[in-house]
C-alpha cells in the first residue's frame, strides 16, 4: 500500500523507494534507508534517500548546521544521481550536515550509475553494494571504473576508509572524479587522500582534518586541510575554503564545482547540477572564477572574511594568484600582499602596480587597493584616478622614513620643481625613487614616511602632528594629478610636525588652504606648501 506522502513533494526519484526525509528534516535530513535499493545503510546514521539513490552516506542527524534549502536542492531530491549531480561530490543532501559523517560516503546512486562500487560501506553506487566494476563511478558511469570501490562510508570521522581514497587511508587510485563531470573521470587520480593530507589533486577531500578522508564533514573538528574547506557561516574557515556548514570550517576542501569552474583545479566546486551551490556559503561563482586554481576560501556573506588564502578574483582577473584572503565585504585591512584589483588586471599578482593616471605604472611595491579600497595595511591603497598610480616606489616605512634616501620626486607641474629632491614627475616619471627624504628646510634630513591620508577631494590631511601615521590612507582620486594625498609630515626625527598638507589637485602650487602652514621652522615653507629646498 502506498505509504502516505510525508511531503507534498514528489519523490526524489521515482525508481527509488527511499522515503522522503521526515518532515522536520526538510533538507537532507537523515532518513531511514527504507528499503532503499542501496539497502546497505552501512553507516549508523540514517541515510537520506534522494536522487543520490539513497545517499548511503550516513549523515548525522543534525542536519541543522547547514542551511536547509528547500526546493529541488532540498534533500538531494534532484534526480541526478549523486555522481551525475555532482560527481565526486559526495553530496550531502543539501541540508545535511556533512560533518556528521566525516567520511560520509554517499553511495552514488546505483541503478543508473551502475553497480555500487564496493561492497564496502555505502557503496556509492547502486543498489548492489557488492563491489561494482566501476568503483564508485562518481560521475555516474562516465568515469571509467574507478580502481577503488571507494565506498565512502567510513564512520564519522575515523579514517573513514572512504575507500574512495583507496583503502581507508590510502589515496584512492581511482580517478575519483570528484570534480564533477568536467573533471573527466580520467583526470588525475585525485585520490582522496584520507588522512594523508592534501592529495595530489587539489581536491583533497581530506580537509585539514587529515584523517578524515573525505572530511566532507563540515563541522568536523580540525581545520580542514583541504584547500577548500568550506566554512559556512563560521568565522574564517581555516581551510582555504572550509566548507563547514555552520560548524566551523568544514574540512571539505572540495570546491566541488563541477564543470563550471572547469576542473577547478580539481577543486570540485560543489556547484554541479541543480544542486547548485551545495552549501550556500560557497558562492562558487562558476565560470566567473574561471579556474580558481588557488584554493580560495569562499567566504560567503556571513563568513566574513575568510582569512585563509582564498584568492577570489572576480571576473576577468582570472586566477588571483596572490594568496590573500579576500573576504566578501570589506575585509578590513587586507594584510595579504594580494592587491585586490578587480577588473581585467589578469592574474592579480600580489604587488601589482596599478598603472593609473599619468603617473604611469606605480612601481611601488605596495599594491594599490582599488578605490579607497579597504586599505591594504601595508600598501596604501591608491585610489585610481589620475594619481592612481603613485609612481613612487618609495616604501612607506611606518615610522621614521629611516634611511629611505631615494629622493622622492615630489613636485612636478605647478608645484614647481621642488628642487632636486624628489622630482616627482607625473606621467613619464614612472616610478620615482623610493623614499623621499624630506631633507630640506628646517625639517632637516629626517625622511618621514608620509602616510597618504586622503579625505574628500584632497582629503583633509590630518592637521597636527601625525606622528608616524603609517596607516595607509587611501589616496583620493580626482584631479590631484600629483600625489594628491596629503603627506602628513610626521613629527619624529623631524621634530617639526609638519601638519600634513595634502597636495592639492589642480594647481597644487596654489592651493594655499590645502596646506596648513605650521608656524615655527615650518613657517619657512614655500607658499605652495613645499618645504624649502
Swiss-Prot record:
Residues 1-31, 67-164, 177-259, 299-350 are annotated as: Disordered. The modification Phosphoserine is found at residues 160, 432. It comes from Mus musculus. The gene is Derpc. It comes from the Eukaryota. Belongs to the DERPC family. GO terms for cellular component: nucleoplasm. This is Decreased expression in renal and prostate cancer protein. Potential tumor suppressor. Residues 299-309 have a biased composition (Polar residues). The modification Omega-N-methylarginine is found at residue 396. Residues 1-12 have a biased composition (Basic and acidic residues). It is found in: Nucleus. Keywords: Methylation, Nucleus, Phosphoprotein. The modification Asymmetric dimethylarginine is found at residue 368.
Amino acid at each position: 500500500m502506498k505509504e502516505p506522502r510525508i511531503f507534498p513533494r514528489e519523490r526524489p526519484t521515482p525508481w527509488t523507494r527511499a522515503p522522503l526525509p521526515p518532515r522536520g528534516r526538510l533538507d537532507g535530513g537523515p532518513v531511514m534507508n527504507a528499503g532503499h535499493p542501496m539497502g546497505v545503510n552501512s553507516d549508523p546514521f540514517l541515510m537520506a534517500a534522494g536522487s543520490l539513490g539513497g545517499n548511503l552516506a550516513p549523515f548525522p542527524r543534525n542536519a541543522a548546521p547547514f542551511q536547509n534549502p528547500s526546493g529541488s536542492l532540498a534533500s538531494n531530491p534532484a534526480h541526478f544521481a549523486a555522481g551525475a549531480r555532482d560527481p565526486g561530490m559526495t553530496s550531502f543532501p543539501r541540508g545535511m550536515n556533512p560533518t556528521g559523517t566525516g567520511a560520509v560516503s554517499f553511495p552514488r546512486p546505483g541503478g543508473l550509475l551502475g553497480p555500487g562500487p564496493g561492497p564496502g560501506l555505502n557503496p556509492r553506487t547502486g543498489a548492489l553494494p557488492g563491489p561494482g566494476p566501476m568503483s564508485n563511478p562518481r560521475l555516474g558511469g562516465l568515469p571509467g571504473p574507478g580502481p577503488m570501490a571507494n565506498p565512502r562510508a567510513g564512520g564519522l570521522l575515523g579514517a573513514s576508509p572512504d575507500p574512495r581514497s583507496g583503502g581507508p587511508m590510502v589515496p584512492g587510485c581511482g580517478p575519483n572524479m570528484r570534480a564533477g563531470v568536467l573533471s573527466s573521470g580520467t583526470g588525475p587520480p585525485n585520490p582522496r587522500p584520507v588522512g594523508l593530507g592534501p592529495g595530489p589533486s587539489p581536491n583533497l577531500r581530506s580537509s585539514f582534518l587529515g584523517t578524515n578522508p573525505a572530511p566532507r564533514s563540515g563541522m568536523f573538528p580540525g581545520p580542514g586541510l583541504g584547500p577548500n574547506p568550506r566554512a559556512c557561516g563560521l568565522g574564517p574557515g581555516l581551510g582555504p575554503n572550509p566548507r563547514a556548514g555552520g560548524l566551523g570550517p568544514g574540512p571539505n576542501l572540495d570546491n566541488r564545482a563541477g564543470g563550471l569552474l572547469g576542473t577547478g583545479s580539481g577543486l570540485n566546486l560543489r556547484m554541479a547540477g541543480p544542486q547548485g551551490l551545495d552549501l550556500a556559503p560557497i558562492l562558487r561563482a562558476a565560470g566567473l572564477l574561471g579556474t580558481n586554481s588557488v584554493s580560495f576560501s569562499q567566504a560567503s556573506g556571513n563568513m566574513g572574511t575568510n582569512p585563509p588564502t582564498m584568492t577570489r578574483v572576480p571576473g576577468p582577473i582570472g586566477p588571483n594568484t596572490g594568496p590573500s584572503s579576500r573576504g566578501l565585504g570589506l575585509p578590513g585591512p587586507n594584510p595579504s600582499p594580494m592587491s585586490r584589483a578587480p577588473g581585467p588586471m589578469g592574474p592579480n599578482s600580489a604587488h601589482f602596480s596599478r598603472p593609473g593616471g599619468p603617473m604611469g605604472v606605480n612601481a611601488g611595491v605596495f599594491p594599490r587597493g582599488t578605490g579607497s579600497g579597504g586599505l591594504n595595511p601595508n600598501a596604501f591603497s591608491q585610489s585610481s584616478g589620475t594619481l592612481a598610480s603613485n609612481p613612487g616606489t618609495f616604501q612607506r616605512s611606518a615610522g621614521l622614513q629611516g634611511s629611505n634616501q631615494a629622493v622622492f620626486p615630489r613636485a612636478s607641474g605647478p608645484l614647481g620643481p621642488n628642487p632636486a629632491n624628489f622630482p616627482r614627475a607625473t606621467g613619464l616619471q614612472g616610478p620615482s625613487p623610493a623614499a623621499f627624504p624630506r631633507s630640506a628646510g628646517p625639517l632637516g634630513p629626517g625622511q618621514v614616511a608620509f602616510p597618504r591620508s586622503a579625505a574628500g577631494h584632497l582629503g583633509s590631511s590630518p592637521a597636527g602632528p601625525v606622528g608616524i601615521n603609517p596607516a595607509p590612507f587611501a589616496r583620493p582620486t580626482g584631479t590631484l594629478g600629483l600625489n594628491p594625498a596629503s603627506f602628513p609630515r610626521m613629527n619624529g626625527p623631524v621634530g617639526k610636525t609638519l601638519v600634513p598638507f595634502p597636495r592639492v589637485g589642480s594647481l597644487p602650487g596654489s592651493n594655499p588652504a590645502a596646506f596648513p602652514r605650521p608656524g615655527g621652522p615650518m613657517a619657512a615653507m614655500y607658499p605652495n606648501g613645499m618645504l624649502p629646498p
